[in-house]
From Swiss-Prot:
Cystine pairings recorded for this chain: 21-32, 26-40, 31-66, 50-74, 68-81
Pfam families the record matches: MIT_LIKE_ACTX
Lineage: Eukaryota, Metazoa, Ecdysozoa, Arthropoda, Chelicerata
GO cellular component, one term: extracellular region
UniProt protein name: U1-hexatoxin-Iw1a
Lineage top rank: taxon: Eukaryota
Keyword Disulfide bond assigned: yes
Similarity annotation: Belongs to the MIT-like AcTx family.
Expressing tissues: Expressed by the venom gland.
Length: 84
């Protein structure tokens, strides 16, 4: 039981101290996602799920997926990164 309590406390601490992000804080090749918590995630590679680069929240974060990396586009039919 004590181990369970310790694990729960660690999870709560991790959530409490999680770094908030914006695209300015995320490094090159990443974007800020606002999915349950804000966190940096890598840009979409070929066939990865993606979001339109213009679809952002008021704070500048993406909701579920990052935009595609340079040279790829987000196909709005399949919502996946495709070539050019």
């Amino acid at each position: 039981m004590l181990k369970f309590v310790v694990v729960i406390c660690l999870v709560i601490m991790a959530i409490t101290f999680a770094e908030k992000c914006g695209d300015q804080e995320c490094g090159e090749g990443t974007c800020c996602l606002d999915y349950s918590q804000q966190h940096c995630s890598r840009l979409g590679k070929l066939y990865d799920m993606c979001s339109d680069p213009n679809d952002k929240t008021d704070s500048g974060s993406h909701i579920f997926f990052c935009q595609c990396e340079t040279g790829l586009r987000c196909d709005k039919t399949s919502w996946s990164c495709q070539k050019g």
